[in-house]
Amino acid sequence: MNELSKAHCSIWADLRGTSFSQGWLDAGGIRTRFLHAGNPGKPVLLLLHGVGGHAEAYARNLRAHAEHFDVWAIDMIGHGWSDKPHHNLEIPHYVEHVLKFLDTIGAKTAHISGESLGGWVASRIAADHPERVLRLVLNTAGGSQADPNVMARLKALSLQAASDPSWEFIKARVEWLMA
């Protein structure tokens, strides 16, 4: 990669050549941001990001999946450009939000792929609402039982990295996640 291309790298460069839309929908009273690609006549594939993530986590996947699915990547409640409530979020809040989103786009069923927190949410949806899930794909899914001390440490590191995205704090969070 030459210096000019390094200077102009962007997450949006991954979407170059991909026919997609970006927008917001009201999912049960929650303004929800999405990236959408693919054919509405095909089965829905919903992509759920991890803690502190956003829809762009799947920017490199949209084009390939759009050939076979009606693909939606969302900013889950409390993340990205979607609404942020004034209360702590628990898994049932995320599950309700995702189900309302599916209802809003008219999807009775969907293939759901989740990464980290998104995997935890996806697996909870599959367990509680199996009639809504065609296929479940879990990528480094969070557990169904979280240790409060581990979750507190994850929250502290994530907030620190978000409020001061210096190399030191980002590195500390990633190293902790990979330990």
Question: What feature does the model see in each segment?
Answer:
Residues 18, 25-37, 42, 60-63, ...:
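Active-site loop/oxyanion-hole signature of alpha/beta-hydrolase fold enzymes
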Residues 1-24:
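An N-terminal hydrophobic leader/cap segment in hydrolases
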Residues 120-128, 133-169:
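Flexible "cap/lid" loop of the alpha/beta hydrolase fold
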Residues 50-63:
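The serine-hydrolase catalytic nucleophile loop
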Residues 177-179:
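Alpha/beta-hydrolase
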Residues 52, 76-80, 143:
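Alpha/beta-hydrolase active-site loop signature
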Residues 42-50:
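Short beta-strand element of the alpha/beta-hydrolase
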